[in-house]
Every structure is written in C-alpha cells, then in structure tokens.
Design a protein with these regions (language model features):
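Short, amphipathic alpha-helical interaction segments positioned at domain boundaries
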Residues: 268-285
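Short amphipathic alpha-helical interaction segments
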Residues: 237-251
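A short, conserved structural fragment
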Residues: 251-261
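Solvent-exposed, charged/polar functional surfaces in cytosolic regulatory/catalytic domains
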Residues: 128, 132, 249, 253, ...
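Extended hydrophobic-aromatic, low-complexity segments
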Residues: 228-229, 241-242, 258
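C-terminal scaffold of the Radical SAM
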Residues: 1-237, 275, 285
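Minor-groove-contacting beta-hairpin "wing" of winged helix-turn-helix DNA-binding domains
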Residues: 262-266
C-alpha cells in the first residue's frame, strides 16, 4: 500500500482480516526525490503509517526502498537506510532505480534531463545496504530482501521456490508447476464475466526448458541458491552437468560457489545476479 493510504480505518480493517503482513512503498525519505517520483506521501507519512498499524495490532510490516536516484550520494542513501531502521519494521526490500523503456523516467534520461547513477556508486550503495541491515540483525535471504528472524515474506518465497499458487481477482496470476495463468486486467469485464459464471483468463503452458530456466532464475535469487539434487530429479543428471559447466567460470571468478548440493551466489555475485542468471538460463535452449 501507499503510506498515505494508511489511516485508522484502514489499519483497523486490516487488523480484523486474516492478513499477516502489510507492505508499504516508502521508496525514499528525501522530499526532493519523492517529488521526483511523483509520490503523494511525505517522509513523515511513513512513520505515521507504521505507528497507526502498530496501534491497530499489526506486528509484521515491510517497507520498500529505492536507491540510485540521479544526484543521490552515499550519504543520502545512508540517511535513508538509517531512517528505515529507526522505524523498527520486520522486513525491508530495496531496489535500484530502473529506466524502463516507455516510462517518463526513460524519456527524461534520453532527453538528457536526468543522468543515470554511476554503476560503481550503485554497487557501493547496494553493499552498504547489505552490511548495515545485516549488522542490524536482518537476514539477507534474497537478492533485494531482508527480514528479521522468522519474518521472511512467505508470499514471495513461494514464487522463488516454485510452489504452486492461485491468484484471485482481476489481473491475478496463478502457477501450477506446469503452466502460468493470468486473469484479464479489465476490472468491469472481469466482474461481468464472473457474474456469468466464467473466469476470463489466459494460459501459457511451460515446456521443460522454460521450467528449467524458471528454476535457475528464481532459485538463484535466494541465498540458498539452486538445489542441484532437485534439478536432477526434475530435469535429469545431464541438466545438472550442463548447469555446472556453465557455472564454472563464475565459480573461478568468485561470483558463484558450490556448497554441498547447492549452487549459490556469493556476496560478490549478488550485485551482478541478473547477468549470472542470464548465462545459466541458456541451459536447455
């Protein structure tokens, strides 16, 4: 939810429902950068929202942050991290600002109105985040996610571990291990179809190559990494051998490590996880 959406009524309603976590998109506590993102809320709204949720009895709160803004310094980012820690929330997620094609931000960069943050700076910001949150007692359990003991996101973890899930409502996605389904995103049409007794959705059947690549991409995001024993059971010993062959150069350069039956990213590999995953996902193509 957005921090400015959290009032007493919202908090009381959520507390009365079987909701086990509330996640808020704080993004930053810097007023200029909030305006840059065109966010409605202020930095103080985040603290007020956490307080309202706590008073309503919500004991599991997550806050999302962003870093790598144009002209952002290490000192700016450190202040955001410290402010987030002062909230005392159970879970934190942090993502580097991305310039996605077709977005206003992408257009601003292309027109020279903003400059993308230097990669060495964003790398340093990432490791500052990791070090500071781990020192504060948070488990770094996924590339971008941190949790106090016993407070991992079970919802997102089901995606990363390949557990089947069902999505309910317009635009909701589902997965059963062999296919992905998604409901149409047009709410009025969705409601009318449901009234007619029909759930309007599309479906994508996954072949072994796609399922294999999903396993690589999702499992590597977790600190536990890829369970090679599970890979062998699902895709055969040849798939494991090919995966290990492709992994060899990353093991030599210290980006991946093999620990027992698990292939996992090292601390150095976490920041370049997307590159490593893309190399390993060529298996089965």
């Amino acid at each position: 939810c957005n921090p400015d959406d959290v009032d007493d009524t919202f908090s009381e309603v959520v507390a009365a429902l079987p909701v086990n976590r509330v996640s808020m998109g704080a993004q930053t506590f810097n007023a200029d950068r909030l305006r840059f993102l065109r966010r409605r809320h202020s930095a103080s709204d985040v603290a007020k929202a956490v307080d309202k949720l706590r008073r309503a009895g919500i004991g599991n709160i997550s806050v999302d942050l962003m870093y790598g803004f144009p002209e952002e310094t290490m000192e700016d980012w450190e202040r955001d991290i410290e402010t987030a820690l002062q909230l005392g929330v159970e879970h934190l997620s942090a993502y580097c600002l991305m310039y996605e094609e077709g977005t206003p931000l992408f257009k601003m960069r292309e027109e020279g109105r903003v400059a993308e943050a230097d990669e060495e700076l964003t790398r340093a910001m990432y490791y500052l985040l990791v070090d500071r949150l781990e020192a504060a007692g948070y488990e770094h359990y996924e590339v971008s996610n941190f949790a106090l003991e016993g407070r991992r996101s079970l919802h997102n973890s089901s995606y990363w571990t390949g557990i089947p899930y069902m999505g309910i409502g317009a635009a909701a996605h589902s997965y059963n291990g062999k296919s992905r389904q998604w409901n149409i995103d047009n709410l009025p049409i969705y409601i009318n179809k449901v009234k007619e007794g029909v759930v309007p959705f599309e479906k994508e059947l996954l072949d072994d190559s796609e399922r294999h690549n999903d396993m690589v991409m999702l499992a590597l995001r977790r600190r536990e990494g890829i369970d090679l024993s599970r890979m062998a059971l699902e895709f055969g010993a040849a798939a494991v051998e090919e995966c290990l062959s492709l992994s060899r150069k990353f093991v030599k350069t210290g980006l991946l490590s093999i620990e027992g039956s698990h292939l996992r990213l090292t601390r150095e590999g976490l920041y370049v996880s997307d590159m490593v995953m893309s190399e390993l996902m060529s298996v089965g193509d």
